[in-house]
Amino acid sequence: MPALDSLKTLRSLAVDGKTYHYYSLPEAARTLGDLGKLPMSLKVLLENLLRWEDGSTVTGDDLKALAGWLRERRSDREIQYRPARVLMQDFTGVPAVVDLAAMRAAMAKAGGDPQKINPLSPVDLVIDHSVMVDKFASESAFEQNVEIEMQRNGERYAFLRWGQNAFDNFSVVPPGTGICHQVNLEYLGRTVWTKDEDGRTYAFPDTLVGTDSHTTMINGLGVLGWGVGGIEAEAAMLGQPVSMLIPEVIGFKLTGKLREGITATDLVLTVTQMLRKKGVVGKFVEFYGDGLADLPLADRATIANMAPEYGATCGFFPVDEITLGYLRLSGRPESTVKLVEAYSKEQGLWREKGHEPVFTDTLHLDMGEVEASLAGPKRPQDRVALQNVASAFNEFLGLQLHPSSTEEGRLLSEGGGGTAVGANAAFGEIDYQHDGQTHRLKNGAVVIAAITSCTNTSNPSVMMAAGLLAKKAVEKGLQRKPWVKSSLAPGSKVVTDYFKAAGLTRYLDELGFDLVGYGCTTCIGNSGPLLEPIEKAIQQADLTVASVLSGNRNFEGRVHPLVKTNWLASPPLVVAYALAGSVRINLSEEPLGTGKDGQPVYLKDIWPSQKEIAEAIQKVDTEMFHKEYAEVFAGDEKWQAIQVPQSDTYEWQADSTYIQHPPFFEHIAEAPPAIADVEQARVLAVLGDSVTTDHISPAGNIKADSPAGRYLREHGVEPKDFNSYGSRRGNHEVMMRGTFANIRIKNEMLGGEEGGNTLYVPSGEKLAIYDAAMRYQEDGTPLVIVAGKEYGTGSSRDWAAKGTNLLGVKAVIAESFERIHRSNLVGMGVLPLQFENGQDRKSLKLTGKEVLNIRGLGGELKPHMPLSVEVTREDGSQDSFKVLCRIDTLNEVEYFKAGGILHYVLRSML
């Protein structure tokens, strides 16, 4: 670790009788100038550069550029950042470990040492993405779901156990433990990290990157971290720095306090709306202001969690007394807490009252103005005041008559028994039967109510509010509506401990919010099947129904393929909507139902007071954290019973449908081909705005008649055992077939028709996008995707780039790109190109039937260089337009030339 240290900043600090060495920011300021007004998040970056200064990847000029940020409040300087550790979840972690295993195989084949492929920084992988809500509203739901999860995912879990044994610095948190970001917040994160080297203990800020976009949650603990693609995380593990531009930093000033009855969820939805409107993509957001003095750590974590939804790289909170209080509450050693305080104060990383750093730009929110809110129907930034939800739904519905639909097999349906009868499509309603009773399902029905996601289940105030509201509802005699699939899936076992201690578990159970698992569940689309008669009723009457969840994303089709509108809400509002059964009820004015005394019961009658919530929170104690995290890496007997081979290289199974040897490194021993212009390319799809990584590479159900479904059936897998796309990310054959296969994706080449199809232009046939891509590959035709604004928004899903690469796509031309997906495209050797301002696919009249040549790649490739696209139209006419090459840094140029970032890293080791 000892750096070049050209500024002579290495100092020592004694804390509790132990000496720590560190690279001093105050000492650096003697040479670089006053750093007092530098944003805290940039001070963390500056310390990172001081510690890693080597004269080549980090130079004295980099240090000066970061310190000089204060002059212009922005910089175009590229720096090399090295986080202390890497965090993964299993959906992104499995393909990452598959890549590492494939790199070891390639290394062995080339005559090298496979052991060279090893994480150099600590990597924690938390298995949280696989549990599904198959069973619900019963005392045995949790045990049954765990059993099903282990049956479905045994092969994947055995592979991860192999990885845990085969790789150094690689730990796995077994299934049924919690959600990675909540485990990170409550246990893994330290705020100040230490490392023993050369007989010294070095102290430095805890920093990380994660293979999940909500890695930002840890920013609430004063830990700088954000999501990157799995590809970039793998490179970071192997010692490659994260290449980044010194960011703009937007200051968000918080003042005042939340009013009675207003939750942290209402606050984060307001912050998300404000920042999306401001435009903070690719920027840091840092929170400051006197409002932080009364903002609990859990509320800070909730706000930091949703940085991807407001578009920022991170949402950083500085260290203060509240940080120390949370570290103590969550059971961190007192020695850690004392080090955090001493180090933060010594380095100028401690929040002082009244201190205001200099920012690129600022926003201000008086928290006293926040109102009760949800976000929906299909974007997290679309905040809707509680009293306006019904009208927002009606507006979405368009008040139009929905024709009856009888395509019963249109979407994958799983689940129990029963039939749907009595369709009345003109009024958007239908009767269905279940358990011998007839119920009427209408447009706006809440069919899923899920207390889910680390965003909110990490926050005792909103969780206790949900439990207290449930208690009052039961005491009033209210019940959830029979068509509501209700579930409780916290991000940590501590939550169920404090519910039990507060005496609230039985009330949640009585309303159907029984524990279904410790994992992401509904928030990531693992909502499981609805009851079969309900699924059939929705399809027969073509109903527009709703989910209400305490999650962070609500893109159309994400939560469940049959649920078109999804509403983000606080946990107590999730319970309230389960009681109401519809989003077409104004909960501010209309009753939730009728009590056992025959009187209407309103939301205000059962909403808990801040005093009641505060009293309940007193039940949360440190011993709960100690108990639940004492054996966090051990797992249950099912996990421990998994048999795994002891070998440095993985023994690939040819008949496996979960884990396959990917083709990415087949020719790694050969020199990469020179970069050349793209000639005679065809357009694979023309897509609109806000195309998400869910659209590009879905995580949910696999349709039986899709290319991926056909592949699985051909390999002996029954549709009931398909599992999900997310669970099969270790098999490139499934994933490339699933690329652009989302049932909600709209291809303008087919008039905006929904579904993963396209026009195969040479013959005029409509084909699945995968099938068309394979035809083009047979012809030797390169492919291009054309899209609108915010291409690749959403999850940090590396398969959205990997699948694009395997389909033969050479370039994506869009109006703008979301940060992580742009980086992932470059990391997989796919060229991101941006239309010039004022131009787009519509103004250029691009239909997708054109032949395209991309010119300017043959010379010296540079970041942000202009390129030309030549167009030959269907009638033979020709023209051209300019695009901006969105390879943003010199490092990315080198990665692109090598065919991708992992190819670059692997070749450097051969």
From Swiss-Prot:
Keywords: 4Fe-4S, Iron, Iron-sulfur, Lyase, Metal-binding, RNA-binding, Tricarboxylic acid cycle. SUPFAM superfamilies: Aconitase iron-sulfur domain, LeuD/IlvD-like. It comes from the Bacteria. It holds the Pfam family Aconitase_C. Its EC number is 4.2.1.3, 4.2.1.99. The keyword 4Fe-4S applies. Binds 1 [4Fe-4S] cluster per subunit. It catalyses: citrate = D-threo-isocitrate; (2S,3R)-3-hydroxybutane-1,2,3-tricarboxylate = 2-methyl-cis-aconitate + H2O. Pathway: Carbohydrate metabolism; tricarboxylic acid cycle; isocitrate from oxaloacetate: step 2/2; Organic acid metabolism; propanoate degradation. It is an enzyme of class 4 (lyase). Involved in the catabolism of short chain fatty acids (SCFA) via the tricarboxylic acid (TCA)(acetyl degradation route) and probably the 2-methylcitrate cycle I (propionate degradation route). Catalyzes the reversible isomerization of citrate to isocitrate via cis-aconitate. Could catalyze the hydration of 2-methyl-cis-aconitate to yield (2R,3S)-2-methylisocitrate. The apo form of AcnA functions as a RNA-binding regulatory protein. This is Aconitate hydratase A. It comes from Pseudomonas aeruginosa (strain ATCC 15692 / DSM 22644 / CIP 104116 / JCM 14847 / LMG 12228 / 1C / PRS 101 / PAO1). The gene is acnA.
